[in-house]
Amino acid sequence: MSQKTLFTKSALAVAVAIISTQAWSAGFQLNEFSSSGLGRAYSGEGAIADDAGNVSRNPALITMFDRPTFSAGAVYIDPDVNISGTSPSRRTLDADNIAPTAWVPNVHFVAPINDQFGWGASITSNYGLATEFNDTYAGGSVGGTTDLETMNLNLSGAYRLNEAWSFGLGFDAVYARAKIERFAGDLGQLVAAQNPALAPVAGQIPSDTKIAHLNGNQWGFGWNAGILYELDKNNRYALTYRSEVKIDFKGNYSSDLPIAINRFNLPIPTATGGATQSGYLTLNLPEMWEVSGYNRVAPQWAIHYSLAYTSWSQFQELKAKSTAGDTLFEKHEGFKDAYRIALGTTYYYDDNWTFRTGIAFDDSPVPAQNRSISIPDQDRFWLSAGTTYAFNKDASVDVGVSYMHGQSVKINEGPYQFESEGKAWLFGTNFNYAF
């Protein structure tokens, strides 16, 4: 595998792996910004204002709060993603639990200024992915370790025009940190089998040889906006937008292969003998539109729904360059725009207890021909339930749980053919307090 190809796949895994855990929405997007939302499959988030977390989705909801309100919690993600297959070398490609468990924390604060103005702030994560394979995995040249975390800092404000219309605007600062490692696996054996003249060199590369290590971190900036229309106190609708965020990763590349191996022109990344090279990669995180609604159809019952549209077609290629300006790779990705649809219901049992449930469908933006075991993306179906217990008018606790089921997919990557299947359980809790 050439350095150009290796960097293409490594950078893809790094750039789209923006998460503190495995991504559990389509593509590499995260929804886990609140536990109440988790319990309703994040349906109606732009129009519901039951806790401060909703403001991170729609800043116009700030006008629905009459007291400073705080919410903090986390969602625990327990994925079960398995890969199967057989390499041309006859070595197994089976790997279980390639996505690690992790916590996705969230913190939110909302404060009214007067009857017309208010502000809010939040700390969340909106994109990401993480996968881990054994160092001696046969498909190590496309597997290995992929881990990238993001933190989204949002500051927003809102203005109420009248009893019906409210508008909000926010600023996003996104910090991303990435790490990718790739190993030789059986790539040396495959090269030796195809070209016996190279067998003395390629055939001697141990499976756990680190053929690529890439890490980097950077800030990116964007904005979000929202409109809230209140037909009356029981019916409201929202339109929200979150902009594209450009991340210019700056980092290091190295390979443990001895430099002398470069003269054989093997299909593996250029060896550095453990030395480090500097490089950079630009990734455009896609923009998202969402339409939401909330209807209190009875004194104790409400329904809520959302349709989100993410412009994944903005993610068409990946290009990595050295600091000298040389193109290390250029690869067409061809993602397609995708949607997410969610529907839920809430039951207001009494002043203390609230129960909710929801279902959702995540459309995968990754075309079948572009799937990777570092991004084993697939269409996903959500089933969710949750509850809120209010201790009094000031303090409450949210609990939510979701089960996510992904369809089985086939992946063709390099000389390998895989099958992937995945599911996940998500558990969340938040504490809310109004001052």
From Swiss-Prot:
Membrane topology designation: Multi-pass membrane protein
Family under the similarity heading: Belongs to the OmpP1/FadL family.
Domain of life: Bacteria
NCBIfam families: PRK10716.1
Function: Involved in translocation of long-chain fatty acids across the outer membrane. FadL may form a specific channel.
GO annotation, cellular component aspect: cell outer membrane
First and last residue of the signal peptide: 1-25
Protein name per its UniProtKB record: Long-chain fatty acid transport protein
GO MF annotation list: long-chain fatty acid transporting porin activity
One Pfam family in the UniProt entry: Toluene_X
Keywords: Cell outer membrane, Lipid transport, Membrane, Signal, Transmembrane, Transmembrane beta strand, Transport
Major subcellular site: membrane
Gene behind the chain: fadL
InterPro entries for the chain: OMPP1/FadL/TodX
Compartment(s) of residence: Cell outer membrane
Organism for this UniProt entry: Salmonella typhimurium (strain LT2 / SGSC1412 / ATCC 700720)
